[in-house]
Amino acid sequence: MHRLDKDTSGIMICAKNDAAHLSLSQQIQAKTAQRTYLAVVRGNIKTDSGVIETLIARDKNDRKKMAVVKEGGRDAVTEYEVLERFGKYTIVRCRLRTGRTHQIRVHMEYLGYPLVGDPKYSPMKTPFSIQGQALHSQTLEFTHPRTGERLSFEAPLPEDMHKIVTRLRLGQFN
């Protein structure tokens, strides 16, 4: 139904049949299915929340990456909310209004706050032990295609991200 970038942890939805696929696709298109992510970014985000609205397209210099562009891209909208600040790092909740490839990673890097451990958009070494970027698909909310019941699912943080958050809360690496 939707993709998770390589090395992004968390919850995904898969359709069991064609009718469910159609219903869920329509919900994603109509933005009635909600997807929320947690990220640990490098830097101290000053604003408590915001909306990032840009165009995103393939990077001209590296076809494996995406980039914010002035024209010729697809609309990409990400809402973000700062949950905790730790000197050099911030924990942020992101909600997708659109679902572009690498959208959160590109948007946070565009603001100057790349994801910790992101090998594509933030190749700097990190003091944390993490496989890939610190990005977790935390919640997914949608209407059941057959029953019409509103469903909400939440995935706990993976161990490596949980350790990062714990170390930040203990005052390490601030």
What are these regions (language model features)?
Residues M1-N174:
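RNA pseudouridine synthases
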